[in-house]
């Protein structure tokens, strides 16, 4: 109700503010600056002239006879005085608003529906950072202008009063008043955005503009840097919302698990009419998650071994053992594919422990496929294996079994002997013969010796097949209640996929599954790149919009691996546009193992967005791409000298000089990036043009119904992944949602009742908007 009553006052204030700033802009537009130095950090002397003009206008209007003027002339003079008062007032407001915004900027909120019809990619409100902004920033940081960057003493005392406990009725009421965001409160608290607000204020005199990223440039990939809790995920919400409503294929990797991001994706998919295309894969909630096989889809069978071997250590002597792992897994994968079995981690674990069952199945298939009656001869070999060496010679069997095969079964040995005898005579294809030779080699190798060579494979497979995670990455196609997806299916259906990797619980499994998914997606992208965008896809009408594959990778440093390099290098031709979010450059270096590999990855990102970063090497990625500019200051020199001529009437000479002194500085400094408030960023767009951005905090138009499974996951994510110190951060929705959980525990007759229950907790106007939205949806 309080907001509703203050709405007319806020509206009137905004109208007057825009009108006054427009007046100043019209008067300044197209004119050269009158003075060598812009003077925005000074006392607002214009208001004195405004009062003088107003008094003169009132005097001429009400007492023209005392000015000895006829009323017509007096009223004309009064109108001129009023006009001059307006002009000088606008100039004064221009300076005063600039100084006021040095300490506080209002929160930038936006309704998500405003992003649903944009042709280009909106990244925020801001301006292009130029030399004038570096000049203003230089002026602000001068010691003589320090008073403009400090709050008043009364404001500090008000904040100190609100921070203490109060027990009296009047004291508590006063604390609530001083802590309220009301126009009637001259000491209302500044938004808790941290950082230095003037980094954005320096561009406010010219005004903010919507900053867009042209869609064709997105295939050259984007990387977003920012330290913890400064707005990376909120920027991701802005970009993902537009991708969903544009009809693109959206794939989001979220290692840590962000509740608001999951809800945002589902609600925007529902608003776009794409609810049926939404899939959720979450390692932390297997009971609600869709299923996916990381090694079940491939273009070449060798990709299975590559995806697994890439998870093995490959530095130093470990590189040789990784090659053994690759060869062993490749042998198993070839046998499974020949049998028509889809590779999966549980099956790979089973056959890596004992390859004999796979060997027997492959041999039986080959004999049956080529109509060879092997059973009689196989039985003879089995019987011969039970004989002594002398009896075998008498029976006409002249063979020896390698010592490495002593632990194998009699049936397996019989198949091995049979293939040695008749293998060359069978009309096998090249592929079949290759698989048969691989199986023979794997079978006759000493199991204990092979176990030592591929010792690093067992821990990896244990990670991937332990607990409930194994049910997610080994899909059960006979279960009708669980969705199973593949990347080809997602691309065909223009799907929207949220992938929660639960890295806070198990970072190793999260990284492994994420890398396997990347490798699978890279394979699919390679197929599209070679055979065209329509390969395996429905025939889209040529006049329609060709959907892109929008890949968003939060906490990119936890997912970066060898699989990511070919995706960045070549997948742009298949329509894959990657947006990666990470904290620092050293995080990526630590993940990939070297600085050169990290730079190889970063060289493929043409668009860089940098929120607050504290690491100097990370900040230099942006700083080194900007040029130097000249900033100026007015230096005053004074001096005096005595006149030695005693006969002259001039006893001394005094001089005062003002000089404009310039110096070369960086257009942007590393220290500026460490002082950015939350939700603000610098970005290199459109060919290394530097922009300063404010990222909007998206608001829900009204809470819509959310399915029970997604609601349960959201509740658990809020409980398990969040902690109380961050609940007041800018990067959360506490500004417009109450602290109560959006999904209250209890039983509801319908999802509409759940939605209504939440909306009743909001103010009345929001509740009415929500009711109207629900009725319109019905």
What are these regions (language model features)?
Residues 1-230, 234-239, 287, 657, ...:
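Basic- and hydrophobic-enriched, low-structure N-terminal and domain-boundary segments
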Residues 16, 20-26, 202-206, 215-228, ...:
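P-loop NTPase motor domains
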Residues 39-44, 76, 316-334, 485-489, ...:
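P-loop NTPase motor core of the ASCE superfamily
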Residues 94-102, 257, 261, 563, ...:
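Short acidic-hydrophobic sequence patches enriched in Asp/Glu that either
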Residues 583-587:
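Conserved H-loop
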């Amino acid at each position: 109700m309080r907001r509703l009553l203050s709405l007319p006052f806020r509206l009137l204030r905004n109208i007057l503010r825009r009108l006054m700033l427009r007046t100043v802009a019209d008067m300044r537009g197209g004119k050269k600056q009158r003075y060598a130095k812009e003077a925005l950090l000074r006392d607002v002397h214009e208001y004195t002239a405004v009062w003088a003009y107003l008094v003169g206008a009132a005097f001429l209007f009400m007492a023209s006879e005392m000015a000895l003027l006829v009323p017509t002339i007096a009223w004309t003079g009064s109108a001129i005085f009023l006009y001059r008062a307006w002009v000088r007032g606008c100039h004064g407001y221009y300076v005063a608003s600039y100084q006021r915004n040095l300490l506080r900027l209002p929160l930038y909120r936006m309704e998500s529906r405003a992003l649903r019809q944009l042709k280009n990619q909106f990244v925020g409100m801001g301006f292009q950072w130029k030399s004038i902004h570096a000049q203003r920033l230089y002026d602000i940081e001068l010691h003589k202008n320090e008073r403009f960057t400090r709050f008043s003493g009364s404001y500090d005392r008000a904040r100190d009063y609100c921070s203490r406990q109060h027990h009296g009725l009047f004291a508590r009421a006063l604390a609530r008043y001083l802590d309220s965001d009301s126009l009637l409160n001259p000491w209302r608290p500044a938004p808790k955005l941290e950082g230095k607000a003037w980094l954005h204020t320096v561009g406010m005199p010219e005004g903010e503009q919507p900053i867009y990223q042209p869609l064709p440039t997105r295939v050259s990939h984007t990387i977003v840097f920012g330290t913890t809790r400064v707005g990376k995920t909120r920027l991701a919400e802005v970009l993902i919302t537009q991708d969903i409503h544009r009809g693109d294929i959206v794939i989001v990797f979220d290692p840590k698990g962000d509740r608001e991001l999951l809800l945002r994706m589902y609600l925007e998919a529902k608003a776009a009419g794409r609810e049926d295309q939404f899939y959720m894969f979450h390692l932390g909630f297997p009971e609600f998650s869709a299923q996916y096989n990381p090694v079940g889809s491939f273009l070449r069978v060798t990709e299975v071994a590559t995806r697994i071997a890439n998870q093995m250590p490959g530095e130093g002597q470990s590189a040789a053992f990784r090659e053994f792992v690759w060869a062993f897994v490749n042998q198993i994968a070839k046998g499974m594919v020949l049998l028509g079995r889809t590779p999966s981690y549980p099956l790979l674990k089973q056959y890596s422990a004992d390859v004999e069952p796979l060997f027997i199945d492959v041999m039986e298939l080959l004999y049956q496929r080529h109509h060879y009656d092997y059973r009689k001869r196989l039985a003879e070999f089995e019987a011969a294996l039970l004989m002594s060496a002398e009896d075998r010679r008498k029976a006409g069997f002249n063979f020896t079994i390698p010592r490495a095969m002593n632990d194998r079964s009699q049936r397996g040995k019989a198949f091995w002997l049979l293939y040695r005898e008749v293998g060359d005579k069978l009309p096998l294809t090249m592929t079949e013969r290759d698989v048969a030779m691989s199986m023979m080699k794997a079978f006759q190798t000493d199991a204990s010796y092979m176990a030592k060579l591929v010792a690093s494979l067992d821990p990896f497979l244990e990670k991937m097949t332990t607990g409930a995670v194994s049910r997610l990455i080994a899909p059960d196609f006979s279960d009708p209640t669980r969705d199973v997806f593949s990347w080809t299916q997602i691309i065909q259906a223009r799907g929207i996929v949220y992938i929660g990797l639960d890295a806070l619980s198990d970072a190793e499994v999260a990284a492994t599954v994420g890398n396997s998914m990347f490798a699978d997606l890279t394979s699919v992208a390679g197929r599209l790149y070679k055979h065209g965008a329509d390969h395996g896809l429905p025939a889209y009408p040529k006049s329609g919009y060709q959907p892109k594959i929008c890949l968003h990778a939060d906490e990119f440093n936890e997912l970066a691996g060898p699989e990511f390099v070919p995706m960045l290098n070549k997948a742009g031709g298949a329509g894959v546009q990657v947006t990666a979010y990470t904290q620092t450059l050293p995080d990526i270096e630590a993940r990939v193992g070297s600085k050169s590999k990290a730079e190889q990855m970063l060289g493929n990102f043409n668009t860089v967005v940098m929120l607050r970063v504290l690491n100097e090497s990370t900040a230099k990625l942006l700083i080194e791409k900007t040029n130097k500019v000249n900033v100026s200051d007015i230096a005053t020199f004074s001096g005096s000298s005595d006149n030695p001529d005693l006969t002259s009437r001039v006893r001394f000479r005094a001089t005062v000089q003002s000089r404009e002194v310039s110096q070369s500085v960086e257009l942007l400094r590393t220290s500026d990036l460490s002082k950015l408030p939350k939700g603000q960023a610098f970005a290199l767009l459109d060919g290394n043009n530097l922009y300063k951005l404010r990222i909007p905090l998206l608001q829900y138009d009204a809470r819509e119904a959310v399915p029970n499974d997604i609601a349960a996951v959201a509740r658990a994510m809020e409980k398990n992944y969040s902690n109380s110190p961050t609940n007041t951060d800018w990067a959360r929705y506490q500004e417009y949602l109450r602290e109560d959980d959006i999904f209250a525990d209890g039983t509801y007759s319908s999802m509409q009742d759940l939605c209504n229950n939440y909306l009743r907790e909001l103010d009345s106007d929001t509740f009415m908007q929500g009711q109207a939205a629900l009725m319109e949806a019905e």
